[in-house]
Amino acid sequence: MPKKAKPAGSGKEEGPVPCKQMKVEAAGGPSALNFDSPSSLFESLISPIKTETFFKEFWEQKPLLIQRDDPALATYYGSLFKLTDLKSLCSRGMYYGRDVNVCRCVNGKKKVLNKDGKAHFLQLRKDFDQKRATIQLHQPQRFKDELWRIQEKLECYFGSLVGSNVYITPAGSQGLPPHYDDVEVFILQLEGEKHWRLYHPTVPLAREYSVEAEERIGRPVHEFMLKPGDLLYFPRGTIHQADTPAGLAHSTHVTISTYQNNSWGDFLLDTISGLVFDAAKEDVELRAGIPRQLLLQVESTTVATRRLSGFLRTLADRLEGTKEVLSSDMKKDFIMHRLPPYSAGDGAELSTPGGKLPRLDSVVRLQFKDHIVLTVLPDQDQSDEAQEKMVYIYHSLKNSREIHMMGNEEETESHGLRFPLSHLDALKQIWNSPAISVNDLKLTTDEEKESLVLSLWTECLIQVV
């Protein structure tokens, strides 16, 4: 494969071509990635592509393949997950369906070979060796610290949940049929080699997962081999399939995914209810009743459609004149379900406040800023119609890594604080300042100032400097 940068071809007459090929210099240090900040982590992950170039030319547009002749990076990638890691994980308690799937592609369809209950390494290895089955491990960041470290930083960078799956495929086999996903995908090749084929999307920026029949997808527009240390990105909706060629060692890769249900459409759905709620307080037309029997109509009437169109224009005008865009669910959902900050120790700094107790003469600063959201919502403790607005602060410091991206809604709870709307300006001061004197906070009394910072300090959200 060429070692110089080469743009992706169209894939029309000349056949499948690579997306983008780059050679990078070996990164220094034991991790081979830069964890100084979320942006530095992402920049090192896609190196040597520049972040600006990535978002201008590739993000949500087309695939990017970065092929690297870098032994240090290949070794680091290999440390993220190995086939042999399954043995120790099974001894900790892994269950079919929840934690691991065993499958293979047969005649263009996914055949699931799961057993019932607990997964045992010897059985997994038997299916892997004898049935040529792919082993898929769900959300390995729950168990592998370095993946936790990577994905936590990526969640800070994207402001969106970041999940992962490990796929281990034996030689001469394919685990999944051609399909497309509803997520932005970054693939890191960890062990062995894998043969990839990418096709034009039938549904660009798809909102759901779908299997596609071979006869529908045509010829691949990109075809290549991934080797340890290589990285592949493709947008949601990109049809793809991958196999481990016969005669080679098994392949292991991790798929890191993000931006599920994180579109402008999702954000509009999330914010429109808040806009209507506020507008209805001031506009009597929005409080007027709909025509009798409108809900019994098979189709909306012309009058109703015209009325709704007018309301939407009014809301659009109102939106342009305000800075208050209320996210009712997306902010809270993200913070509630994301990873807690990476901690190499016991995580005491996330649950026990440290340092000096903040006083009126203290200077304080926010910590774990990427793990906190501040939002204004109607008081959730009031059930009457005249709900007063409150300031809510949600954080992920106490989130459970063990259930990250596992859909355990009954085990998920929100962590945070609630303040009167009169505290909003003071909270914005803390958010927007590198450090600020407690005495300078925009609150009426000294007692309010001390009470505010003490509440934040108790939740480990600020520190005295």
Swiss-Prot record:
Q: Name one GO biological process term.
A: ribosome biogenesis
The catalytic activity, as recorded, is:
L-histidyl-[ribosomal protein uL15] + 2-oxoglutarate + O2 = (3S)-3-hydroxy-L-histidyl-[ribosomal protein uL15] + succinate + CO2; L-histidyl-[protein] + 2-oxoglutarate + O2 = (3S)-3-hydroxy-L-histidyl-[protein] + succinate + CO2
Cofactor names from the entry are: Fe(2+)
Cofactor note as given: Binds 1 Fe(2+) ion per subunit.
Give start and end of each JmjC domain: 139-271
Which residues are Fe cation-binding? Answer: H179, D181, H240
- What is an example of a GO molecular function annotated in this UniProt entry? identical protein binding
The answer to whether the entry has keyword RNA-binding is no
Q: What is its EC number?
A: 1.14.11.79
| Annotated InterPro entries | JmjC_dom (IPR003347), NO66-like (IPR039994), ROXA-like_wH (IPR046799)
Its localization reads:
Nucleus; Nucleus, Nucleolus
**Where in the sequence is Phosphoserine found?**
S309
GO terms under cellular component:
nucleolus; nucleoplasm
UniProt keyword annotations, A-Z: Dioxygenase, Iron, Metal-binding, Nucleus, Oxidoreductase, Phosphoprotein, Ribosome biogenesis, Transcription, Transcription regulation
Q: Which SUPFAM superfamilies match?
A: Clavaminate synthase-like
PANTHER family to which the protein is assigned, alphabetical:
MINA53 MYC INDUCED NUCLEAR ANTIGEN, RIBOSOMAL OXYGENASE 2
Purpose of the protein: Oxygenase that can act as both a histone lysine demethylase and a ribosomal histidine hydroxylase. Is involved in the demethylation of trimethylated 'Lys-9' on histone H3 (H3K9me3), leading to an increase in ribosomal RNA expression. Also catalyzes the hydroxylation of 60S ribosomal protein L27a on 'His-39'. May play an important role in cell growth and survival. May be involved in ribosome biogenesis, most likely during the assembly process of pre-ribosomal particles.
Q: Which family does it belong to?
A: Belongs to the ROX family. MINA53 subfamily.
Q: What's this protein's name?
A: Ribosomal oxygenase 2
